[in-house]
A protein has these predicted regions:
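Long, charge-dense, low-complexity tracts
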Residues: 1-112
């Protein structure tokens, strides 16, 4: 009888992920304009964008997947897209040790 596989979580310290996210938001606020518009943002569309950014790359720095100039709403949707991709095991979020840089790669990319 087969046993149900336990969900696999990213091998990243949550505190470091939060710190990296806070750094990205801080940079976004430096280039923030005050034009307010209503914009529909698709998580699925941003999932595709993240996957395209990772194609052909062994690893990408976590910060490289975000463009602070696009504003906080796009950054938030991109983060949600990245976490959804990790949940669906399409990407891996890794960190060598505490306080080390965080990297993202396609889950099916050979490590070596």
């Amino acid at each position: 009888m087969e046993q149900a596989q336990a969900p696999r979580f990213p091998d990243v310290d949550l505190t470091d992920l939060q710190a990296a996210w806070a750094d990205i938001l801080g940079r976004a606020r430096l280039v923030q304009s005050h034009k307010i518009t209503r914009e529909q943002l698709s998580v699925r569309e941003h999932m595709s964008i993240v996957l395209k950014k990772l194609q052909g790359r062994r690893f990408a720095p976590f910060e490289a997947l975000f463009d602070p100039a696009q504003g906080v709403p796009v950054l938030v949707v991109t983060l949600i897209a990245l976490l959804e991709l990790a949940k669906e095991t399409l990407v891996e979020i890794t960190q060598a040790e505490a306080y080390a840089p965080i990297y993202v790669r396609l889950a099916f990319t050979p490590a070596g």
